[in-house]
């Protein structure tokens, strides 16, 4: 894990292992090992921040939230839910070396047209952007 950059998020205690010649990280929410990629590094830290610092219960943090958009399957990185499992925040994570630009925002807004979360968070672990969706869609 030394090859991944320090992020602008609180440190997370990650459980890592080399399996099948690849670096893997334990996903405590889903109970499985995941390939550790630069984007997954950011996602693990965001999840740690949401649960450990903000206090969001694990049951309200949905990873790789699947939905259909225009007839194709899509996945939002993280969706935080509230009462009745209604989406409160859609989180789009990128690797630390990926700029958070208009294309990333457009992607999140497209996703949110289906997810209908009240808030959108875009992050590459270094920079974080938060948006309030006026009517839950844009």
Task: Locate each region found by the language model.
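A short, conserved, highly charged catalytic patch centered on acidic carboxylates
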Residues: 1-119, 126-138
């Amino acid at each position: 894990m030394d090859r991944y950059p320090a992020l602008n998020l609180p440190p997370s205690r990650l459980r890592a292992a080399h399996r099948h010649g690849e670096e893997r990280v334990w996903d405590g929410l889903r109970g499985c090992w995941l390939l550790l990629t630069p984007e997954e590094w950011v996602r693990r830290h965001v999840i740690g921040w949401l649960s450990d610092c903000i206090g969001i219960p694990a049951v309200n943090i949905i990873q790789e939230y699947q939905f259909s958009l225009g007839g194709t399957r899509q996945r939002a990185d993280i969706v935080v839910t509230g009462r009745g499992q209604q989406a409160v925040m859609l989180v789009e994570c990128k690797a630390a070396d990926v700029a958070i630009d208009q294309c990333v925002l457009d992607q999140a807004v497209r996703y949110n047209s289906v997810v209908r979360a009240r808030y959108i968070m875009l992050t590459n672990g270094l920079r974080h952007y938060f948006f309030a969706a006026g009517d839950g869609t844009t």
